[in-house]
A protein has these predicted regions:
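Membrane-interface "cap" regions at the ends of multi-pass membrane proteins
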Residues: 1-52, 165
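Membrane-interface helix-loop-helix modules in multi-pass membrane proteins
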Residues: 27-95, 248-252, 259-261, 268-303, ...
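Loop-to-transmembrane helix boundary motifs in multi-pass membrane proteins
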Residues: 106-114, 121, 357-397
Length: 493
């Protein structure tokens, strides 16, 4: 049944792309505020959010959604209704084909465009890994198809739709997938709240499930004490989830080029209230739903197997697929399989389109972008991402980590620049200095300080005590902000 669903999904997205052929491959105005809002909201959600952060919540407990929800919703809404119109106004003056081109022209700094383009292209494969690991795990769990075949086939499908329909295909497919994600999330939320969490002794079983965590486990070392409480204040775990969920994800989201592009496509300034509603509703609904579901799985697995959800599933990336396959009726599982495919597709097609336009328009700057370069760059990065996906599959919390890497470095580098644009600042040298400071600091933190990535990339971890668990965006954002503010103040004196 799930194989038929997957084939039907491929037919639908292929048909939408086919009907979009001949549309603008680059930027174009949206015909409908609702379609752009659905596209924006759908792009904000992905398998990395559903499976990666759902799995993180299933491993750690309620401190994950409770820490994330308020800053996530507040920042996304504020950024869309306040920063979004400023970005739109800037491009009305400039008329750029991509967000990266617009930033460079706004600050009259080709170097800023090139730096952002290079960083974006360098980091996209890591975010692709997060998406592909998530959807690959799901396809394998629900169909039995080999993991490698699953991720290769899904990547080819995304590539084909982008080549066929360009930006028009991306927006229209996002709109369809956004509706699917909303419906699927509502079904999971209803079953979680009114069925799973209503079983006798649910809360006491969830508390007791913590006893299945063995002494000396990573959770204890990080400072976590139960599924229903926050970790010890200023412990490794507290710093990890606070800097990840309050800074990396919300701040990273509002600076990502593929999301800023949606703002540039708005019909007018009045569009942003509609865009903001969908931009908050779709990701917040999906993230909270699957986090609550994954946490609830611990009560079930403890009663039935005497294990926590991560022990029963075999890893954080497997918690959500395992729970949907075992804890929900088969008809619901089929719908949720479609939901995950939709979430993965919206993110991957935005990333692939961003990558091709960045290379063909922003790195190789010509009056008429070379489409052969655009398509060829997609093929090369897809191959690289597939190799990385297969190599990194099985790494602990790889989905959440790969997502945080992309969000963190972009967020640390770009937030002061974006805020500077909002306030009408146009000094390109200041923007470049701030960008370089944020990028260099966050990359250094990734390579030599952060507890997980430093071991993965260099094998060298400088001992900063509990601060090894602080996300790279925090030091990077401090440095980039100080540089931008200091240079701006010095110039005004």
């Amino acid at each position: 049944m799930n194989i038929l669903i997957m084939l039907l999904f491929a037919v639908v997205v292929g048909y939408v792309a086919y009907m979009s052929r001949g549309g603008n491959y680059f930027l174009s105005k949206s015909d409908s505020n609702m379609s752009l809002g659905l596209s924006y909201g759908a792009t904000l959600i992905s398998t990395s959010a559903i499976i990666g952060f759902g799995g993180l919540a299933g491993w750690i407990g309620y401190s994950v959604p409770l820490t994330m929800v308020i800053p996530f919703v507040a920042l996304i809404y504020f950024a869309t209704v306040y920063i979004g119109p400023k970005v739109w106004q800037a491009n009305q003056e400039i008329g750029a084909k991509t967000y990266i081109e617009m930033i460079g022209k706004y600050f009259n700094s080709p170097m800023l465009s090139k730096l952002l383009a290079v960083i974006t292209v360098g980091l996209i494969p890591f975010y692709c890994v997060a998406v592909l690991v998530g959807v690959g795990k799901f396809i394998t769990t629900f169909t039995g198809i080999d993991f490698t075949i699953a991720v290769v086939g899904f990547s080819v499908l995304v590539f084909g739709t982008i080549v066929s329909g360009g930006m028009s295909s991306v927006i229209k497919n996002d709109m369809v997938q956004g509706v699917v994600v909303i419906l699927g999330s509502l079904i999971v939320l209803a079953i979680t709240l009114f069925s799973h969490m209503q079983v006798e002794n649910f809360w006491s079983n969830l508390e007791s499930a913590w006893t299945a965590v063995p002494e000396g486990d990573t959770l204890y070392k990080l400072g976590f004490t139960s599924f229903t409480s926050w970790p010890e204040f200023w412990s490794r775990g507290w710093l990890m989830i606070t800097t990840l969920l309050v800074f990396t994800i919300p701040v990273g989201l509002i600076t990502l080029p593929q999301l800023q592009t949606r703002w540039m496509m708005a019909k007018d300034e009045g569009s942003f209230k509609v865009i903001a509603r969908w931009g908050v509703v779709i990701p917040a609904l999906a993230i909270v739903t699957f986090m609550l579901a994954a946490i609830a799985a611990n009560s079930y697995t403890f009663v039935t197997e005497g294990k926590t959800a991560i022990q029963a599933a075999g890893g954080t990336a497997s918690i959500v697929p395992y729970w949907i396959a075992t804890g929900f009726p088969s008809w619901v599982s089929n719908i949720l399989f479609l939901t995950i495919l939709a979430a993965a597709f919206t993110t991957l097609n935005s990333l692939m389109h961003l990558l091709s336009t960045t290379i063909s328009n922003d790195i190789i700057a010509t009056d008429t972008p070379n489409m052969k370069v655009a398509y060829g760059s997609m093929v090369l990065v897809i191959v690289l991402a597939l190799v990385m996906t297969i190599a990194f599959n099985g790494q602990a919390a790889i989905i959440a980590r790969a997502t945080a890497l992309y969000f963190g470095i972009i967020g640390a580098s770009m937030l002061p620049v974006v805020i500077g644009m909002v306030y009408g600042l146009r000094n390109g040298k200041h923007a470049v200095a701030s960008f370089l400071g944020g990028a260099a600091t966050s990359i250094f933190w990734v390579l030599f300080v952060h507890f997980k990535e430093s071991q993965l990339f260099t094998g060298v971890t400088l001992d900063f005590g509990v601060y090894n668990f602080v996300e790279p965006i925090v030091p990077g954002l401090i440095v980039s902000s100080v540089i931008y503010i200091a240079l701006t103040k010095l110039r005004t004196k």
